[in-house]
């Protein structure tokens, strides 16, 4: 209640507040106990024209801007995401594939295609 829906983290980035050490303030659960974003849910159900911010859609990938117009992408390892990471391993679904929609929305189809090519080359050469 005291910090509001967002705060500035240790990296100086504005981030969404967390409730009880695990849930984003916009978290809701469906009838099966699956964690959902209430903003995205309202948009998908036609109840809001507001689209979830790309920074939220990309999570656990965090974007960082560098001098010279460079954009870095970092994977934010956090224990609350452990069940999703494990499920991804079981399904053989890496984070960048799971986030295809948001990554394409942010960087474009050509960029995402190149990402997949580079990832495949790394897998083949390791």
Task: Report the location of each language-model feature.
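Short loop/turn segments that flank or connect secondary-structure elements
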Residues: 1-126
